[in-house]
């Protein structure tokens, strides 16, 4: 992490997840990087049995904490991220191409990983956070970055027959 305050905040989410009843399968809170013991490092943490009523599900943690939310049906798996307040990203792991295409098309999030985690933070992937997960009015990479520096113009033309000279400055109406 960049600061001790952020490290402490992420660790507090892990503590909160345990208090709320999630099962911590991998605990990286004790990670130390040799030679950098005073740094703000934390190993990965993996929660299982996370439910939508838990804060670790409801809030974006911005740290190495992954939550597994189990869905009973495909439609529930599609609905959970689509109805979440944040629309940053989701991953689906499947061997069924039709299911992957359907999920990627229907899910209401900005980034979808199929058979691998969400493709960030590599700069050549577009950041597509949606809903409360977006930052600003444009995405930071990809077409929106180009649009930010582009001046666009819309021209609407109409060339009716019968006007020989002069100009008309009225909206045509049906007679």
Give the positions of each predicted feature:
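Short, solvent-exposed loop/turn elements at beta->coil junctions and helix N-caps
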Residues: 28-35, 117
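Conserved C-terminal structural/oligomerization subdomain of aldehyde/semialdehyde dehydrogenase
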Residues: 14, 37-175
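Short beta-strand segments
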Residues: 25-28, 92
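Short beta-strand to alpha-helix junction loop
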Residues: 1-10
